[in-house]
């Protein structure tokens, strides 16, 4: 087990500054690096630190960052989710890592969960300087996930999303939707999502629980599954059989599209279980084994 340090890292991305934690293991050789960020509307302190620590103890450098508009990263309005901007933040962090002389830039790994798992799949299909990716319960097909909404909910969500988008064009304050809600309209409307999402929230950090609604329209059109055939690096893909947010068939189809480069797992858990207890331990051990096989150890 390696000791490590954690250093604050601030990187310019567009007109904003991205805040990150840089986990640096104490090793004789330059370590491989894992770049990590969270899913929809989540901060890096929402259960991702436990992953970063375990990777660093295993000898891997880790860059764990918050998107613009979130956490200590800059940008307004606060808590805005922009798929385009968040993908650009990923590209910025990768470009920054390529310039650091203290790590092995030939061994860059992307790690994503839920929505950021979709980002990792997109980037693996797009970029040539990524050596492997690891995704858990990834968001792969917004068109299919949109079918989770009832016929009463979907038009309402689209209406609020459109109102927020048009209002932003003329400088109006954002119209927001809850990320989760037990009874009302929200981004994650399934029965287990309310308790599941709140189980990862860190009460030591500000989180309003609502985000500007404009992203809803983009989410239901976001389909990383379409780019999966262009991936030619090793992929660890962990799906959950009881996932109420990510249709199982969409995960299976995505994995089929990535073959033969994918190591695919289906576990009998719900979407948010992977951050806790036995499922976290199983996930981290599986991920470390994958890294050992495809990236090596220090």
Segments predicted by a language model, with ranges:
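N-terminal cap/lid segment of alpha/beta-hydrolase-fold proteins
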Residues: 1-29, 277
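The serine-hydrolase catalytic nucleophile loop
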Residues: 40-53, 67, 249
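Conserved alpha/beta-hydrolase
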Residues: 54-74
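Alpha/beta-hydrolase-fold enzymes
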Residues: 121-203
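Short beta-strand/loop motif that positions the catalytic acidic residue
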Residues: 231, 237-239, 243
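Conserved alpha/beta-hydrolase "acid-adjacent" motif
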Residues: 244-250
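Catalytic active-site module of serine/aspartate enzymes centered on a nucleophile-bearing elbow/loop
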Residues: 267-298
